[in-house]
From Swiss-Prot:
Residues 97-105, 164-172, 225-238, 299-311 are lumenal. It comes from Homo sapiens. This is Progestin and adipoQ receptor family member 3. Residues 61-71, 299-303 are annotated as: Golgi targeting. Belongs to the ADIPOR family. It is found in: Golgi apparatus membrane. Residues 41-60 are annotated as: Required for interaction with SCAP.
Amino acid sequence: MHQKLLKSAHYIELGSYQYWPVLVPRGIRLYTYEQIPGSLKDNPYITDGYRAYLPSRLCIKSLFILSNETVNIWSHLLGFFLFFTLGIYDMTSVLPSASASREDFVICSICLFCFQVCMLCSVGYHLFSCHRSEKTCRRWMALDYAGISIGILGCYVSGVFYAFYCNNYWRQVYLITVLAMILAVFFAQIHPNYLTQQWQRLRSIIFCSVSGYGVIPTLHWVWLNGGIGAPIVQDFAPRVIVMYMIALLAFLFYISKVPERYFPGQLNYLGSSHQIWHILAVVMLYWWHQSTVYVMQYRHSKPCPDYVSHL
């Protein structure tokens, strides 16, 4: 029996710790914060429940065990299926019933595709962040950040297209500008220090800047439509504000590490800030999808006003 156990075990080394067996397929060991490699040490208030030092096969199998990444993985895996299902429903029911044009189909498809990519990249990172190869972990981290950029791009594409639906010039200006910003973020990831913990604050500033840029086209849209008193502005501006409020709330949870900061070790598996960040990200993207459908239906029900189309 002892020999069979040894043959079915994958051994790892924990620095100054002794060798521990990681049994296949169900005996994936969970570690404390002190035992994990430095690349995983992001939140000292999450004290236990870490997966680490696993090969790819066991990383995948860890999808079905309870760890401190379980909610992070499944929240965005379910988020992916949500947006995939919405894509099918939109293409087969919502858009045809609204007499949508070919452009509408393209824009809505791009938007939902970006959301799905964002969800899958996040799932991939949180699933394989426990890989025994630090190089592999960093590749998945880079994909996670790329996925966030793509998700932001999806919001901008649909938002700019329908906000400047009646003004082709400004629509092209803002779409090109946003695309250039996203590409700049991609190129920034090439820097060897981009994914290090020392650059964590800079990464946050970059993504806040890219997200916050949306205030500029929003204010321009308000001005083009006659100011805050215009009916269309009063109808749609609150939707933009709600989206930004959800994003801000999610970001505050992310950077503050609240509530686990006040309950260290008690929220290792459920209720941590990163899990709340994940759930709010899904809520935000879903809200923006619903807003996109709403404004698309509005654009097809009312013609463009002359004072906008000539500006």
